[in-house]
From Swiss-Prot:
Function: Virulence-associated protein essential for survival of the bacterium within the tick host and therefore within the natural life cycle of the Lyme disease spirochete.
Gene Ontology terms: cellular component: cell outer membrane
Domain of life the protein comes from: Bacteria
Protein name: Protein BptA
Species, as recorded: Borreliella garinii (Borrelia garinii)
Source lineage: Bacteria, Pseudomonadati, Spirochaetota, Spirochaetia, Spirochaetales
């Protein structure tokens, strides 16, 4: 019995190792989590693209949905006011996380989506909820100088910088139509980090 249990666990471990290795080899990780609390539903989908030959190590797309049935009726969705506006803004949220490894703390002063160079960009903190959040333009890159006092420092180890870009629903619909996602990040030191990958948004129905 012990031998059967041992070999069963060993087989599961081998399968898991193979699964994660295969995902990493393909440079793609997709995950979906559905949570229910009372009558409400929270859905979190993440798509991660790993890069090997660049200081830009990961692109993570996050789609978060909050469904509150009692607020979904037509009258509520058409009404105005802080409560209604906040729920409409937060019911579905789209975000990109760009993870850049350097020996410095970075700020990012610009993000350019090819084909939408004239997009309207806001640069306020990504804290939610807030009145600024409700006034989101095409996308928000946060305050590029929030860590300015550390920009001059260099470290003897890798610093994992994360830039979060929050996308409006309207802009998300635009980039979803692209065949390829071509994105350029520009740091506070004018260094460019470029992405050119197949557009995964339609494929995963995000």
């Amino acid at each position: 019995m012990r031998k059967i249990l041992f070999f069963g666990l060993l087989s599961i471990c081998i399968f898991l190792v193979f699964f994660f290795y295969k995902q990493k080899e393909n440079n793609i990780i997709y995950n979906k989590i559905v949570e229910e609390f009372e009558d409400n539903i929270f859905i979190d989908e993440t798509y991660t693209h790993l890069f090997k030959d660049s200081n830009l190590k990961e692109l993570v797309f996050i789609k978060s949905q909050l469904i509150i049935p009692e607020l979904e009726h037509k009258e509520m969705m058409k009404s105005t006011g802080y409560y209604a506006d906040t729920y409409r803004a937060l019911s579905t949220v789209y975000k990109f996380d760009f993870k850049v490894h350097e020996n410095k703390i970075l700020g990012f002063k610009s993000v350019i989506f090819e084909g939408f160079e004239d997009a309207k960009v806001s640069k306020h903190e990504n804290n939610l909820p807030s009145e600024k959040w409700q006034q989101l333009k095409d996308f928000n890159i946060g305050d590029p100088n929030i860590n300015e006092k550390f920009f001059h420092l260099e470290f003897p180890f890798v610093v994992k910088n994360t830039l979060r870009v929050t996308i409006s629903k309207g802009f998300f619909k635009k980039i979803k139509k692209l065949k390829r996602l071509k994105i350029m990040l520009i740091s506070n030191e004018d260094r460019e980090y470029k992405i050119d990958i197949e557009n995964f948004l339609p494929k995963y129905n995000l």
